[in-house]
């Protein structure tokens, strides 16, 4: 691998690296409120940005303690996106975490169509 290629790979964000595992992923930028229930049944939430999407998945950074098969809710500011999804991948890199979650059902108004 050339030095330039290695530098480009090092410069990719954690979410960009996870997106490489989803060849159909397109870059998007959608601000959402992410929420989930902790194992103790406490509601956890944060604001995040969906950075990549496919017709069935979204990829975003998160500081919440999410794991494979956790259920999350994603809601944008005008509630035109209000969906449940299941975590299908988590990637840790340089102290950051990227998450991929698959929609639990058909999302009528999702911007990326199959």
Range-by-range predicted roles:
Residues 1-114:
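Structured alpha-helical
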């Amino acid at each position: 691998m050339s030095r330039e290629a290695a530098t480009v790979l090092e410069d990719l964000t954690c979410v960009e690296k996870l997106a490489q595992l989803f060849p159909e992923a397109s870059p998007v930028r959608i601000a959402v409120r992410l929420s989930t229930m902790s194992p103790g049944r406490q509601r956890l939430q944060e604001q995040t940005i969906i950075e990549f999407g496919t017709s069935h998945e979204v990829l975003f950074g998160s500081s919440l303690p999410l794991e494979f098969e956790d259920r999350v809710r994603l809601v944008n500011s005008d509630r035109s996106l209000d969906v449940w999804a299941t975590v299908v991948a988590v990637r840790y890199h340089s102290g950051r975490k990227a998450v991929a979650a698959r929609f639990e059902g058909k999302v009528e108004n999702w911007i990326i169509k199959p």
